[in-house]
Amino acid sequence: MKMKKHSTRWIAALLSLLLLAGCGARDPGGAAVPAPTAAPSSAPAETGVPAASMEPEPVEEPEIERFPFVYVADAFTRSDGVHADVDFADMEWYLYDMTDFTAVADRLAVTDSEEEAQAIYDWLMTEYLRISTLDELAWIDFYAYGTEADQEACQATDELLLTAGDTLYAAVSDALNGSLSREFSAYVGEEMSEALSDYEEMSDREMELKNRETELQLQYNALLSRRDLSEPELAFRAGEILLELVSARNELAQIYGYETFADYAYESYYGRDYTPADAAALCKAIKPYARRYFKNCCYCDAFYVDMGSAAERTPEQLIDLLGYYAPRISPAAAEAQQYMERHGLYLLDSVDRIAELGFTTTLKLYSAPFLYNSLYGNIYDIQSVFHEFGHYYDAYVNQPENQMISMGSYDVFEIHSTGLEALSYGWYDEIFGDRAEEARINCLDGLMYNIISGCIYDEFQQYVYSHPDMTVDELNSVYGDILSSYGRKLWSLSDRYEWMNVSHNFESPFYYVSYAASALASLQIWAKARWDRDEAMELYNDLVSRGAYDQGYCELLRSVGLVSFTDDLDACLKEAYAALEEMCLRYDSRS
């Protein structure tokens, strides 16, 4: 099955995905930049106005009569032909002025010159990548600094990106239905033509709902930074935000012809080849494992050991760690790590100074993946940096066919990250020394908890989105009941408020089950590595090389000899769970 959906409602979902915080698109791109003889209104990022500027760059009125376009050389050196040789420190965001973009898009619909239409299309695509990159840079600044100005900038750049995408899609659709229909369709390709030939611009209501989503997400981020509110007060306000998001998203799903937002998100946001019903069946089937896990594993004494210097790493040491192990993954992984380090395409810092997040995104104008991870000063820093580097590796080696419409499987993206976590287990003697046993328990526990928590939050979200009239008190109660059904003990009222600290509930609904699905695949890689590490590493690199754009999760696993949870859950999980339980019980018996 090709991961391609050709419908207006899917394109609208793709626009929404570009605005999801914390799970940015991982699709590098970039090509030679065609430009009009009239200078574009927004300068290349490396020559833009200083970062955190809320003022658009000054522009002259667009001179459409000065077209046709001419081609110019790529603005960036790309020594490998793909990734720009630009340091992150030289990338700056600013507010893009849409004047020329809108005028050029209008021109695409009416030109009768085949050469001009092609040049306009290429220029618009490049400018769209620029706008997307400016939005990503603004969000990175927000997570790094969290000022009110950064918050306002994110809302502004999100709105610009949404407007630019809608304008671009509509312009391409008009050209596909215009006087140059056949020639233009041949130039942009069959996939693009099928996807956009019937595109309709967003209605005012759609735009209003999507902009409201951004506003509410920013309110949520601002709320979590407050220290003057009690936990119940925080939960109440977060609940109000979540329930308004649920209302807006349910309305959008109905506009696009879906019965439920879950159906819409599974198909159109995340490119899944399994359904919400399949996920619900997984949630039910995982509960016996979860009850055993919370009884025998979750409170293992190994988690309470101070690992001290064995687990502590500075940001520089974490980058060096990746530099040491990346060549043992593959030459391509080593190249990705060297590119990241050479150009400073990462932010690692204490959770006391930056937002508590881990993500990898792609700065599309530069085809440059960027890794962000907040640090706790413990073992999780090492595990999470391997996790995020799995995403980075994939983003570096895999480019989508088309930046506008290619949509990958987010479940497969997460195999790239959790799979590397599973393989790093084999290096723990070297990394942790005499604390390797505790580290191994932590690693397996983390992957197992990914599965359980992925199910918990998917079940929670499916309930909330199907009961939009519930109150905040009911929200807390339902979450607590779901935890109990998995065997989780509720030690205090605070446990019922945990959902508010998971940003995915607000920013990327129905994403969390991807952690469960991916870990079920990655634990199979871990099991293979127990008996033949080279074979397991070869399998992992094969998975990464296939990317996430051509096959869905279930299809991909079957094609490489792994088992999908939709076929046999025990085959995915039984060996790894038994190993974790045995390790925990043995460790506790010695304590």
Language-model features: where?
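Catalytic Zn2+-binding segment of zinc metalloproteases
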Residues: G390-Q403, L423
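C-terminal, non-catalytic "cap/extension" segments appended to globular domains
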Residues: I140-F142, V385, E430, G454, ...
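Catalytic zinc-binding patch centered on the HExxH motif and its immediate surroundings
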Residues: A311-E312, L345-A368
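Bacterial lipoprotein signal-peptidase II cleavage site
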Residues: G24-V33
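C-terminal motif of bacterial Sec signal peptides marking the signal peptidase cleavage site
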Residues: L19-G22
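A well-structured
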Residues: E60-E316, L321, S589-R590
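Short pre-active-site segment immediately N-terminal to the catalytic Zn-binding motif
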Residues: Y366-V385
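Post-HExxH zinc-binding segment in Zn-dependent metallohydrolases
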Residues: C283-Y289, G408-E437, N442-D445, Y449, ...
